[in-house]
Amino acid sequence: PEKRHLFQIEIPNTMFTPYLYESQGIEIALSNSEIDTVLWNAAAPGVPTEGIKDFLGYLKSKGIRTGVISNISYAPSVVAERINRLLPENAFEFIITSSNFMFRKPNKRIFDLALEKAELQPDEVWYIGDQYECDVKGSLNAGLLPIWYIGAIDLPYTEDINILTV
């Protein structure tokens, strides 16, 4: 099972891959961001979740503000490029990645940063995520209303917490 959430700290690929290649005597004529793009596209080409474009369009039409908090080791520019390419009509006010800010969900600091960027209080925010430990428990601990999106992955949970699921 996934255990990275226990550490709550991200080591970005832009730090790790240069070490990995240099320590093995491998020379690559690509920037760190280009390496991230190649690796991520090979590992997971990316496809929008079914219904996400309509859902984001609905939120936008109702004036509901949106942003992204992502636990990911790829460069922030690579993440933003992929999100904007796959969801070109998104209205995300910000994209926060653990690779850029060190802290991983469920660490409260990454949620606090999003609240600061949005200039909102925790009780004004609904947080939707697909990972129980990182998204649901993390946002709940930060005072946000967690909504667990269970359509992306099917993981059971054992705790008796009253949460919304979609």
Where in this protein do the model-derived segments appear?
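A metal-dependent, Asp-based hydrolase signature
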Residues: 1-37
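Short, exposed beta-strand "edge-strand" segments with a Pro/Gly-rich flavor and a Y/T-containing core
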Residues: 4-14, 46, 104-105, 159-166
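A structural signal for alpha-helix termini and helix-coil/disorder junctions
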Residues: 22-26, 45, 89
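Surface-exposed cleft-lining segments at the edges of enzyme active sites
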Residues: 37-46
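Asp-based, Mg2+/Mn2+-dependent phosphohydrolase catalytic module
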Residues: 53, 57-60, 67-166
